[in-house]
């Protein structure tokens, strides 16, 4: 069974797709698509072929990649129970709350009593997509990492634009070539600043200040944060933003 959700604005469309009630993945994020667009055809075009030496199925790059699905990169959630055992949730669909410009998806792992929520909101006035995630547990646990809903990075990009700086030297840009593995920026100072601006721009090849296409990310949090841009062994790319690892001291049930 396939499920599809979409948010439409005057300048962009976001489409998510899920299979077998698993967590969805972003299959399209770009210029507006007509309401009649065949989402099933888009999902089929988005799927990767299986070749020699590969697994029978490619683990999905979902909005919260799961280690339990043999995802080969950075998972979207890393947590432990009160005894320190690593938890590997398998989230399944529970419900959705869809409005014209917002979407809330709820998933749960009944065995571990964990509930995950992903929120998406497209503000028509700014044409920006805001998204955030929540985790609820029936028993106290220790959270190491929880990413905001994860987005794929464009394949037509050969570099990313990151930012650093200092007093009277703000917003210095750095072009970082894409390569296999993780590029990580982290602020553990408890605040944002010139040194670790929580933003990223992904220009497609040939994009300039006045032409071409680019994708922008900004983590709306003025505290410690972490950004991960990863190219997987199979060539797919993901962008994760979240609070700095181990920001939550001690045990808790709501994150």
Model-predicted regions and their roles:
Residues 3-6, 10, 14, 24-249:
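Polysaccharide-binding surfaces and accessory modules of carbohydrate-active proteins
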Residues 252-254:
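Loop/turn positions that initiate beta-strands
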């Amino acid at each position: 069974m396939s499920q599809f959700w979409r948010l439409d604005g005057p300048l962009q469309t976001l489409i998510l797709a899920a299979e077998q009630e698993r967590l969805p993945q972003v299959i399209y994020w770009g210029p507006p698509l007509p309401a009649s667009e065949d989402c099933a055809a888009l999902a089929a075009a988005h799927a990767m072929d299986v070749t020699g030496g590969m697994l029978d199925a490619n683990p999905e790059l979902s909005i919260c990649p799961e280690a339990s699905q043999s995802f080969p990169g950075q998972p979207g959630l890393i947590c432990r129970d009160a005894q320190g055992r690593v938890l590997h949730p398998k989230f399944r669909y529970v419900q959705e709350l869809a409005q014209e410009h917002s979407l809330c998806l709820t998933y749960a792992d009944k065995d571990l009593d964990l509930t995950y929520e992903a929120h998406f909101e497209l503000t028509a006035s700014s044409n920006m997509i805001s998204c955030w995630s929540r985790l609820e547990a029936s028993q106290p646990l220790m959270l190491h990492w929880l990413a905001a809903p994860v987005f794929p990075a464009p394949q037509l990009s050969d570099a990313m634009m990151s930012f650093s700086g200092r007093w009277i030297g703000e917003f210095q840009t750095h072009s970082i070539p894409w390569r296999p593995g993780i590029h990580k920026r982290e602020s553990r100072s408890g605040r944002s600043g010139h040194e670790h601006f929580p933003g990223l721009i992904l220009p497609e090849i040939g994009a300039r200040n006045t032409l071409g296409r680019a994708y922008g990310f900004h983590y709306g949090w003025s505290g410690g944060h972490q950004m991960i841009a990863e190219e997987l062994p199979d060539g797919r790319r993901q962008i994760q933003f979240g609070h700095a690892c181990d920001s939550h001291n001690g045990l808790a049930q709501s994150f």
